[in-house]
């Protein structure tokens, strides 16, 4: 099996690439390498024989295509899964849309105190972050089964388990992720990575 990942070197896309490669799945990556960070992320996965960086004019047909945000490029896949980020402008035709909560993780736009969420800055210690945020690796692991599932809802929403503690109020077509590791521990891990590779992180306060 192989999967096409559009915007594969966005910080979210990179984590999906890494996850599927670790599972032995071939990944066709589609992205423009136009920053030092993207060059670095390409180096991290480019030596893996199961990864191919695909030119826009040579996009293959795959069973599944994952699109982070949006794309103007053609998509040749039986199933399209689109991660709705804050920058997503429109839904792709025939795509299964996954509405993401606040996500945090390695390589995202951040500082020591906050993360970039769309056009906003969300502080690690804010009530919003503590109640809603999900670590990217937990998000990827929870959504990955959708790539193989025969169930095809048009839209899914992902929530932190902290949002709904009452089993009776769970919404249809929703995924609830429990923090198996305290959020503070994952924040410490991400901050340690940020401090180590700070020069490769990007952040724009405007």
Would you name each region that the model predicts?
Residues 7, 31, 84, 159-160:
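Short beta-strand/turn micro-motifs composed of small residues
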Residues 11-12, 16, 33-36, 71-74, ...:
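Short acidic, S/G/P-rich loop/turn micro-motifs used as interaction or catalytic elements
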Residues 134-206:
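C-terminal substrate-binding subdomain of Rossmann-fold SDR/epimerase-dehydratase oxidoreductases
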Residues 1-60:
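N-terminal Rossmann/SDR dinucleotide-binding element
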Residues 38-47, 114, 166-173:
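Short, aromatic/basic amphipathic alpha-helical patches
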Residues 91-140, 144:
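NAD(P)-dependent short-chain dehydrogenase/reductase
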Residues 12, 34-41, 73-76, 87-91, ...:
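Short, charged/polar "capping" segments at the starts of alpha-helices
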Residues 26, 59-101:
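Conserved Rossmann-fold NAD(P)-dependent oxidoreductase catalytic core, especially the SDR/UDP-sugar
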């Amino acid at each position: 099996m192989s999967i096409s990942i559009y915007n594969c070197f966005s910080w979210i896309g990179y984590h999906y690439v890494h996850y599927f490669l670790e599972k032995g799945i071939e990944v066709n990556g589609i992205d423009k390498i136009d920053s030092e960070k993207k060059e670095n992320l390409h180096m991290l996965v480019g030596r893996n024989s199961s990864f191919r960086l695909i030119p826009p004019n040579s996009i293959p047909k795959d069973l599944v295509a994952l699109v982070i945000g949006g794309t103007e490029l053609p998509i040749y896949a039986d199933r399209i899964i689109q991660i709705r980020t804050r920058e997503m402008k429109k839904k792709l035709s025939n795509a299964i849309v996954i509405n993401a909560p606040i996500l945090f993780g390695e390589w995202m736009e951040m500082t020591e105190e906050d993360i970039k969420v769309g056009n906003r800055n969300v502080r690690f210690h804010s009530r919003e972050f503590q109640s809603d945020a999900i670590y990217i690796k937990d998000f990827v692991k929870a959504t990955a089964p959708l790539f193989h599932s025969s169930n095809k809802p048009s839209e899914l929403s992902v929530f932190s388990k902290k949002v709904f503690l009452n089993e009776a109020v769970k919404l249809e077509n929703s995924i609830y992720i429990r923090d198996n590791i305290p959020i503070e521990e994952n924040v410490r891990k991400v901050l340690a990575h940020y401090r180590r590779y700070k020069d490769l992180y990007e952040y724009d306060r405007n």
